[in-house]
Amino acid sequence: MKLLVADIGGTNARFAYQEKNNSDLNNFAYLKCSDYENIYDAIDHYQQKNNLDIENMSIAVASTTKKNDIKFTNNHWNFKQSDFLKYFNLNKLIFVNDFVAQCLSLASFYKDISENRTINDKLLNDYDLKTIKSGTPIKNAPLLVTGPGTGSVSYTHLRAHETNQ
């Protein structure tokens, strides 16, 4: 696998690494975007500091990913998606909008929520979860991801049977 996962926002770049399929993420790092001239320098720093062999990347960005050019509203790291494969000599690369990434992550535990199972504490813990109103979850109810930021809110309606996770 040798996968770098990243969340690139306007202020911070968050990184983690997965050595093998189904292994835990490790080598967590939080870097200030303003400390680096570009995203390549930040990733190079992270990779060298942790002595990592990176073959694949999955990068969530606070920007649209529909075009080759990635442009941030409040971050000077503008770049082209196509340059990453060449620069880092990657096997696979995925860019996704950060809110879309959050929506897609819901599939990892949607079935557990709808069937009243306990959520894996590696995914979420008591600090991450806040009960707004107690009750019994409604099976197949829509889920919503919201948050601050300069982008638009994304929505996805996932059903447990629609995912293979």
Where are these regions (language model features)?
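Small-residue (GG/TT-enriched) beta-loop-alpha framework at ligand/catalytic clefts
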Residues: 138-147, 158-159
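Single conserved hydrophobic/aromatic residue that forms the stacking wall/gate
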Residues: 157-160, 164-165
